């Protein structure tokens, strides 16, 4: 296989690898969102993101998934969005202890939505083997104070922020992002 073919194959694999971590149309419908609230990132945008990401990280390290999400979010929108992303074990960047606001600027909130303390405490033993069994939700919302995040309070925080997010979406026509099929 030539170097060019290897690069092409690598990018294709990376696309497949990243696709699964964004909300699907079914999830959009579940939350009562119509087509106008779903922004699809087209193949050209996605390919561009993948190429940039691959120059920053070595596939398939866990950081690739978060970098992809961050790149696409920061370069694709200014409005509120809810995006399904991978939960990366042992990655402090993904699970900050708190969320701080800076003069009411928009903040990013990462929350574990699927598992409780005992499973999270398996961090060291579980490692990468169960990485793909996890997910977390990134909520982009305006917060006015520092709020601690813990597994026991996550559901309440998530529900509160999602309600605020949906209200803001109705007011500003924010979007839920997903990748369109290749």
UniProtKB/Swiss-Prot annotation:
GO BP, sorted A to Z: meiotic DNA double-strand break formation; reciprocal meiotic recombination
Task: Provide GO CC annotations from the record.
Answer: condensed nuclear chromosome
Q: Which UniProt keywords apply?
A: Activator, Meiosis, Transcription, Transcription regulation
Has keyword Transcription? Answer: yes
Q: Which Pfam families match?
A: REC104
Keyword Transcription regulation among record annotations: yes
Assembly behavior: Interacts with REC114 and SPO11.
Function of the molecule: Potential transcriptional regulator that is required to activate expression of a number of early meiotic genes including HOP1.
Specify the protein name: Meiotic recombination protein REC104
Q: Native species of this protein?
A: Saccharomyces cerevisiae (strain ATCC 204508 / S288c)
């Amino acid at each position: 296989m030539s170097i060019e073919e290897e690069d092409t194959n690598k990018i294709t694999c990376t696309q497949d690898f990243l696709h699964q971590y964004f909300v699907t149309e079914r999830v959009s419908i579940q939350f009562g969102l119509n087509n106008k609230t779903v922004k699809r990132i087209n193949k050209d945008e996605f390919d561009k993101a993948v190429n940039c990401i691959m120059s920053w990280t070595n596939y398939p390290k866990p950081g690739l998934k978060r970098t992809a999400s961050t790149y696409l979010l920061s370069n694709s929108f200014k409005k509120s969005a809810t995006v399904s992303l991978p939960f990366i074990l042992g990655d402090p960047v993904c699970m900050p202890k708190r969320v701080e606001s800076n003069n009411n600027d928009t903040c990013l909130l990462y929350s574990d939505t699927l598992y409780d303390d005992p499973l999270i405490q398996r961090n060291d033993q579980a490692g990468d083997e169960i990485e793909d069994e996890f997910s977390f939700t990134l909520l982009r919302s305006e917060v006015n104070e520092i709020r601690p995040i813990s597994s026991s309070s996550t559901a309440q925080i998530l529900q509160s922020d999602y309600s605020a997010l949906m209200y803001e979406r109705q007011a500003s026509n924010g979007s839920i992002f997903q990748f369109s099929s290749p």
